[in-house]
Amino acid sequence: MGTVLNKPVKVIGTNQHAALVALIRAERRNAGLRQIDVAKLLHEQQQWVALIERGQRRISVVEFLALAQAIGFDPAKALKKIAKIKN
């Protein structure tokens, strides 16, 4: 069983968060999509995608799944890669 933390879990600025952001950005570019294209597919503003890609916004699991579907990558494979990275 894991250790119970007595302080909030840091997300933004961790190695895993940086890798997740880089992966999303790379997958979007590989798909030939612009930030505005992804934003429109998800009924969001372009700034929402930009904040995620700059690592300035946390990403929920549901948002990650929506991004993966809109961009066209396998979220399970992506998370396996991210999970191997140590913070």
Regions found by a protein language model. Give the residues of each.
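Short, basic-rich loop-to-helix N-cap that marks the start of a DNA-contacting helix
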Residues: 56-68
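Short alpha-helical DNA-recognition segment
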Residues: 32-51
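Residue-level detection of the helix-turn-helix DNA-binding "recognition helix"
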Residues: 29, 43, 54-56, 83
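N-terminal flexible/basic segments that precede or flank functional cores
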Residues: 1-26, 30, 69, 74-80, ...
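Residues that mark the N-terminal boundary/hinge immediately upstream of a DNA-recognition element
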Residues: 23, 34, 60-63
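Short Asp/Glu-rich motifs
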Residues: 47, 58, 87
